[in-house]
C-alpha cells in the first residue's frame, strides 16, 4: 500500500470523526448544552427561555431575559456500545464497551442592555467522539483509537423589534483536537493466507504494531442566527440557523512499521519507521436549521417541540492533500440529509418545583455502506425526564436524565463484517443564577 493510501486512511478517520455531528445523537453531533434541555430531550429549545443555556441555541431568546443570568453545569455520558463479528482469520472481532464515559461541560451568560438590546456568551461542545479498542484487537487496522474533542465559544446579541418579534445573531469559534491510532491486528495472518510466499515477512507484523498514528488541532469559525415570534406570553415560535464551519485541519502522521517492509508491497499502510509526515484536509461542517415551538396550554402545563434538519448532503466527498498541495485522497461519500424530531412537556408544580419530560428520534446521516466501527452510527430514540428546583427567585438547579437506544446495524469495513448495537445513559446538572 502506498504512502498516499496510508495518509488516506488516517485522514478519512479524522475527517469522519470531525464532521460526524451530535457524541450521542445521530451522526455524533453533540446536543448536550444544558441539563434542563436534557430532561425534555431538547424539544422546543429555540422557543423556551427557562435558563441561559437556551440562548446558545437561539440568540433571539436573549430578549426574554430582564436580568443578567448565569448557568453552568455538565452532562455525564455513560455509553454501552458493543461490536461482534468474526475475521477471515477466524479470530473473534467481539469487543464490548468501545466508547468510554465522558463529561460535556457548559457555561452560559446572558445580559440585557435595555428593553430592546441584549447580549450573551457561551462555552459548549458541539462535536465529540471517542472509541477505543485494545492494541491487539484483530480488527485493529479499522479499530484502534479515535478521539475527537471540541470547544465552541459563542458570542451573540439580540434586538427586540416589538412585542412580537425578536432577532438574534451570534459568532462561533470552534477549536477541534483529534487523535487517530490504528494497529495491525490480524493483517499479518490475512496477508500470509492470501500469499504464502509472503508469510515470512507477514509474520513479522505483530498484532500490536502501530501502523498509523495521526493527531492535530485547528480552529474553525462560523455564525448562528435566530428569530423569535411571540404570539402572546404563552405561545411562541422560533426559527434558528447554524452555519457551516470550515476547519482546515492540520495533522501529523507516523507509522512504527520498519521502512524495509515497503518493498514487499504488502496491503498495509506504508511504513515510515516512526518518522513523522504532515498533511491537511479541509472540512465544511454542515449547516443546520431548526423550527421550535412552545405552548403553555394550561396554567401548569406546557408542550414544546422541535424539528431540526442538518444538510449532510453537503458532504459528498472527502479530499486529503499533502503540504505540497498534491491530492492524497479523493472519495465520493454521498451522505444524506438528516433530521431530528423531539416532543416534550413541562409541568409547573409550584414556585419551587418544575418537572419535564420528552422523547426524540435522531435520523442517522451515514449510509449503510459508509458505516465504520470507529463511528458505528445508527438511528437513535431518546426518552428523557428532568426537574428544576428554585431555591428562590434568583437561584435554581436543573437535573436531567436521558436514555438513548440505537438500532442494531451491520458494518462492512475492509475484510471484516461486524454487527453493532449501542445505548447510553446521560445525566446532567446545572446551576442557574439571576443577578
UniProtKB/Swiss-Prot annotation:
Highest taxon in the source lineage: Bacteria
Gene Ontology CC annotations of this record: cell outer membrane
Gene3D superfamilies cross-referenced by the UniProt entry: Outer membrane protein transport protein (OMPP1/FadL/TodX)
Main localization category: membrane
Keyword field contains Iron: no
Topology relative to the membrane: Multi-pass membrane protein
Signal sequence, renumbered to the chain: 1-25
Family named by the database record: Belongs to the OmpP1/FadL family.
Keywords (A to Z) from UniProt: Cell outer membrane, Lipid transport, Membrane, Signal, Transmembrane, Transmembrane beta strand, Transport
UniProt-listed PANTHER family: LONG-CHAIN FATTY ACID TRANSPORT PROTEIN (PTHR35093:SF3), OUTER MEMBRANE PROTEIN NMB0088-RELATED (PTHR35093)
Any one GO molecular-function label of the UniProt entry: long-chain fatty acid transporting porin activity
Keyword flag Transmembrane: yes
Subcellular location(s) of the protein: Cell outer membrane
Name of the featured protein: Long-chain fatty acid transport protein
Pfam families hit by this protein: Toluene_X
General function of this protein: Involved in translocation of long-chain fatty acids across the outer membrane. FadL may form a specific channel.
Amino acid at each position: 500500500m502506498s504512502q498516499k493510501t496510508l495518509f488516506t486512511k488516517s485522514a478519512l478517520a479524522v475527517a469522519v470523526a470531525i464532521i460526524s455531528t451530535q457524541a450521542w445523537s445521530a451522526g455524533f453531533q453533540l446536543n448536550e448544552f444544558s441539563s434542563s434541555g436534557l430532561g425534555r430531550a431538547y424539544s422546543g429549545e429555540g422557543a423556551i427561555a427557562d435558563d441561559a443555556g437556551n440562548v446558545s441555541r437561539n440568540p433571539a431568546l436573549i430578549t426574554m431575559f430582564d436580568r443578567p443570568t448565569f448557568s453552568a453545569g455538565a452532562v455525564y455520558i455513560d455509553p454501552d456500545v458493543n461490536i461482534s463479528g468474526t475475521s477471515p482469520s477466524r479470530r473473534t472481532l467481539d469487543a464490548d464497551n468501545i466508547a468510554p464515559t465522558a463529561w460535556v461541560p457548559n457555561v452560559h451568560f446572558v445580559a440585557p442592555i435595555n428593553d430592546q438590546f441584549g447580549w450573551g456568551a457561551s462555552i459548549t461542545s458541539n462535536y465529540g467522539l471517542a472509541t477505543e479498542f485494545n492494541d491487539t484487537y484483530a480488527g485493529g487496522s479499522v479499530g484502534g483509537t479515535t478521539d475527537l474533542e471540541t470547544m465552541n465559544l459563542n458570542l451573540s446579541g439580540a434586538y427586540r423589534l416589538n412585542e412580537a418579534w425578536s432577532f438574534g445573531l451570534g459568532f462561533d469559534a470552534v477549536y477541534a483536537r483529534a487523535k487517530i491510532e490504528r494497529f495491525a491486528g490480524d493483517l499479518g495472518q490475512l496477508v500470509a493466507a492470501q500469499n504464502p510466499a509472503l508469510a515470512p515477512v507477514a509474520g513479522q507484523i505483530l498484532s500490536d504494531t502501530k501502523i498509523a498514528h495521526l493527531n492535530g488541532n485547528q480552529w474553525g469559525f462560523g455564525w448562528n442566527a435566530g428569530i423569535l415570534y411571540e404570539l402572546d406570553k404563552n405561545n411562541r415560535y422560533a426559527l434558528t440557523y447554524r452555519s457551516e464551519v470550515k476547519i482546515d485541519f492540520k495533522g501529523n502522521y507516523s507509522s512504527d512499521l520498519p521502512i524495509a517492509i515497503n518493498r514487499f508491497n504488502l496491503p498495509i499502510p506504508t511504513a515510515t519507521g516512526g518518522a513523522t509526515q504532515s498533511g491537511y484536509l479541509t472540512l465544511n461542517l454542515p449547516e443546520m436549521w431548526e423550527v421550535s415551538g412552545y405552548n403553555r396550554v394550561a396554567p401548569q402545563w406546557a408542550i414544546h417541540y422541535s424539528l431540526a434538519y442538518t444538510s449532510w448532503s453537503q458532504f459528498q466527498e472527502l479530499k486529503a492533500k499533502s503540504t505540497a498541495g498534491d491530492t492524497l485522497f479523493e472519495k465520493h461519500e454521498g451522505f444524506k440529509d438528516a433530521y431530528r424530531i423531539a416532543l416534550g412537556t413541562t409541568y409547573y408544580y409550584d414556585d419551587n418545583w418544575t418537572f419535564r419530560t420528552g422523547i426524540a428520534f435522531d435520523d442517522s446521516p451515514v449510509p449503510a455502506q459508509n458505516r465504520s466501527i470507529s463511528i458505528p452510527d445508527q438511528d437513535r430514540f431518546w426518552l428523557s425526564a428532568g426537574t428544576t428546583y428554585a431555591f428562590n427567585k434568583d437561584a435554581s438547579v436543573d437535573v436531567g436524565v436521558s436514555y438513548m437506544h440505537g438500532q442494531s446495524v451491520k458494518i462492512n469495513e475492509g475484510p471484516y463484517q461486524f454487527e453493532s448495537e449501542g445505548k447510553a445513559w446521560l445525566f446532567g446538572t446545572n446551576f442557574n443564577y439571576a443577578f
